Regions:
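Juxtamembrane/disordered regions of integral membrane proteins
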Residues: 2-259
Length: 259
C-alpha cells in the first residue's frame, strides 16, 4: 500500500477521533465554565463580602454589586462563562488531554494550574483596582485563582465520564464524531483568526498552537507529535506564569503603597 493510499484510509479515522476529543473537550469546558466560571465567581464575590462586610453593595469594575446575587446577573455571567470556556478551556483541554498523568483528580489539578498560568491575567488583572478596594489582595487573588483549579477539576471529571460513556470513534456513530470534529475545528479556527486580528501575540500562540498540536496528535500520532504538544504546553504555561506573577506582585505592592 502506498503512503498516499494509507493516508486516505487513515484520515477518516483520525478525523473521527479528533471529532470525539473536540466534542468531549468542549462539553467538559462548558460544564466547568458554568459551574466554576459562572456560579463559582458569584460565590467568590459573596466570600469577598463575608471577609469585608463594609464593601457589601459596592459596585465592582464590571458594574456588579459585591455580595448581591441577582438572578439576572448570575444567569448572564453563567451563560457568558459557559460560552467563553467552550473555546478557551476546550482547546487547552484537548491539547493537554493525552499528556497529563495521574488520576482524574490529579489531571484536573494540573489542568487547572495550566489554565491559571495561561489565562490567569484575564481575571487577576493588575489594572483592576477591585483587588485593592475589596477585602485584601491575598484573599481576593486566592479566591479567583481557586476558580481555575475548580474549573480543571470539573472539566477533568466531566471529560472522564464522557470518555467512559460515549461510543468509541470506531463505532457506528463515527460519522457524527467526524462531522463534529470538522465543525468544531472550523469554528475554533475562525475564532483564532478573530483573536489574531486583536494583535496579541501570546493569545495567537495559545489558540492557534492548541489547534495545531491537537490536530497533529490525532492525524499523525507519534513521539514527535507528543513532543510538540509538551513543548507547546510548557511554553505557554511558562510565559503566562511570568505575566501572572508580575500581576500579583503589582497588586500586592500597590496595596502596600496605599496602606
Amino acid at each position: 500500500m502506498t503512503v498516499a493510499a494509507r493516508a486516505r484510509r487513515e484520515s477518516p479515522a483520525a478525523l473521527r477521533h479528533l471529532g470525539r476529543s473536540a466534542l468531549i473537550g468542549s462539553t467538559a469546558a462548558m460544564a466547568a465554565g458554568l459551574l466554576a466560571g459562572g456560579i463559582g465567581s458569584r460565590i467568590a464575590m459573596s466570600l469577598v463580602a463575608v471577609a469585608d462586610p463594609s464593601v457589601t453593595g459596592l459596585l465592582t469594575a464590571n458594574d456588579n454589586r459585591v455580595g448581591e446575587m441577582s438572578l439576572g446577573g448570575t444567569l448572564f455571567l453563567a451563560v457568558t462563562a459557559t460560552l467563553v470556556s467552550a473555546f478557551h478551556g476546550g482547546v487547552v483541554y484537548i491539547a493537554s488531554g493525552r499528556l497529563l498523568p495521574g488520576s482524574t483528580v490529579v489531571r484536573g489539578l494540573l489542568l487547572g494550574a495550566a489554565l491559571l498560568c495561561v489565562f490567569g491575567t484575564e481575571i487577576i488583572d493588575a489594572t483592576n483596582r477591585d483587588f485593592v478596594r475589596f477585602a485584601s489582595p491575598a484573599w481576593d487573588i486566592g479566591l479567583f485563582a481557586g476558580l481555575f483549579v475548580a474549573f480543571g477539576l470539573v472539566a477533568s471529571g466531566v471529560g472522564a465520564a464522557m470518555e467512559r460513556r460515549l461510543p468509541s470513534a470506531d463505532a457506528e456513530l463515527g460519522l457524527p464524531f467526524a462531522l463534529a470534529g470538522v465543525g468544531l475545528i472550523a469554528l475554533w479556527s475562525v475564532i483564532a483568526v478573530l483573536v489574531s486580528a486583536d494583535g496579541d501575540p501570546y493569545l495567537i500562540a495559545v489558540f492557534e498552537g492548541a489547534i495545531g498540536v491537537s490536530t497533529l496528535a490525532h492525524v499523525r500520532p507519534s513521539h514527535l507529535a507528543s513532543g510538540f504538544a509538551c513543548a507547546y504546553l510548557a511554553g505557554i504555561s511558562a510565559v503566562g506564569a511570568i505575566g501572572l506573577v508580575r500581576a500579583v506582585v503589582d497588586i500586592v505592592t500597590r496595596d502596600a503603597r496605599l496602606s
